[in-house]
Amino acid sequence: KGTGAHAASPQEGNNAVTDISAVANMPYLENLRLRGTSVQDLSPLSGLEELRELQFGDAVWDTAVDLTPLATLTNLDYLSLPASMAPTDLSPLGELTNLTGLSFDGSSNNGWITDLTWLSDLNQIDQLYLPVGELTSLKGLEGATALTELNLYGPMYLTDLTPLASLKNLQRLYLYSNGTSGGGVVTKDLTCLSSLTRLSEINIEADGLESLRGIENLTELTSLRIYNSGNYDTASLRDISQLQNLTKLKELQLYVAADIQDFSPLSGLTGLTSLQVNGNFICSDYSFLSGLTELRELYFNGDSQNIRIKDLTGIQNLTKLQTLHLTVGALESLHGLENLTELTDIYLTGSDASFTDTAPLQNLTKVKTLRLPNRGYDVETACDLSGLARMTSLQEFNFSGKIKSLAPLAGLTSLRVLDINDQARDGEPALDLSPLASLKGVTDMTLQSQRVSDVSPVGQMTGLRTLYLGVGSYEHPLRDISALSNLTNLSSFTASGWTEITDTSPVAHVANVTIN
C-alpha cells in the first residue's frame, strides 16, 4: 500500500521502461512518475482512482498515445506530459475537472496543439503550459477561470483574445510564438486584458500593436515584455502613454515604431530594474531616463542615424547600472559615465562618433566587456585610450577609430578578446604594437590598421587561437610574419589588407590559414 512510484530515465545503453501493467495492482497510488519512459499503453492507469500526481515529462512518445484511460482519474491534481509527444487527441483530459496543473515538460522543437476547447470544463486548473502549433483560437480558455498562470508557446496567430477576459485570477500571461514571422498576437491594442487587474507579468509576442491601451489599470504589473516577431522595421507601437501609472513595474521590454519620439511616460517608472527598448525610434537625448535610479540593466537599441546623442549625461544618475546597451549616433563625448562604477558590460553602438578621450571610463574598474561606438573616418583627432589603463577586469574590448597609442592597454592582462580597427590613414606615424606583447591571455584578436607593417610584438601573445590582421599599406605592406611561429595555440590565421608575404612557414602549424 504505497503512495508513490517512480520509473526513472534509463541509463545509457539500457532499454527504456515500456510496460507499466504492474501499477494496476496499486489502487492506493497517489503519485506516479514515468519520466523518460517509452510507455505507449496507458490502460493500466485507468483504475488508479486515488492518483493525485502523474508525470510523463521527457517520456518518448513517437506515435500518438491514447489518453482515454486517464479520463477516469478524476482526483488527478497535476499532470505533466512530454513536450515532444506526437500529435494526440487531448479531449479525454477534459474529464479531469479537479486538475489544477497541466504542463508539457522537456524540449520541443515543434508545438502541435491547435485546439483548446477541451479546457472549457477545467475550472480548477491553476497553471497551464502548452506547446501549440498554428493556434488560431483561444476558445475553451474562457472556462478555465481558476487560472493564475497561462503559458502558450509555439506558432500561433491570434486575432481574438476575448476568451482571456473571464480569467479574473490570472497573474502571469505568456503568449510566445517562437519568433514566427507575422505570428503571435495580432492586435492593435490590449483592451481585451483591461479587466485582468491581478496580472503581475505579461510576456507576449505581438504584431501590429500600435498602442498599449488596456493596460493602464493593470497597476499590479511588475513585468511587461512585448516582443515583435519581425525586425525593428516591422514594429508599430507608437503610443506608450498608458505606462505612466504602472509604478510597480520592475521589468519592461518593448519594440517601438519608427515615428515614436515621446518616451516621457517612462520617466515615472522609478522602480524599474530592467528596461529594454528596441526599434527605429527617433531620439536626441536620454534625459527621460535620469530618474530611473534603480536600473540594473538598460538596453536602448535602434538605428544610429535616428539617435543623435552628444553625450551621456542623461544617464549619469543611474549608479546601480551593471549592463548598458545604448545606440548612440554622432556621440561627441563619453561624459555621463564617470560615476557608473557598478557597470560590468558596456555596449555603445553607432557611427559617426567624434569623442577624443576615454577619461570618463577611468573609474569603471568592474567593466569586463567594452564596446565603443565607431568614430568617423573624417575625425582627424586621434582618440586617447588612457582612460582604460585602470580597467584591469576588462576581458573584451572593441574599438573603431583613429588611435593615439596602444600603451594604455599594456596592463589589461585579463583581456581575452581584442578588436581594434585603427582608422588612421596611410602616411601617418606607425602604430606601435609593442604594448600588446604583455597580453598573453588574449585568445581572439582582430587588428586592422594601414599604419602597421611590423607585427613582431604579436608573436609574444602566446594565448592567441584566432588572429585576423588587416594591416599594411601600399608603401609599407606586411611582409614578415616570422614572429607568428611562436603562436603554438593558433588555429586560425587571416592576413588581409596590403600583404606581400612570401614565406608562410611561420604559420605552417596553423590549421586554417588565409592570406589575401
Regions of interest found by a model, annotated:
Residues 1-18, 28-40, 44, 50-69, ...:
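Concave beta-strand-loop units of leucine-rich repeat
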Residues 360:
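Conserved alpha/beta core surface patches that mediate binding of polyanionic ligands
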Residues 289:
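Acidic, Mg2+-coordinating catalytic modules of nucleic-acid enzymes
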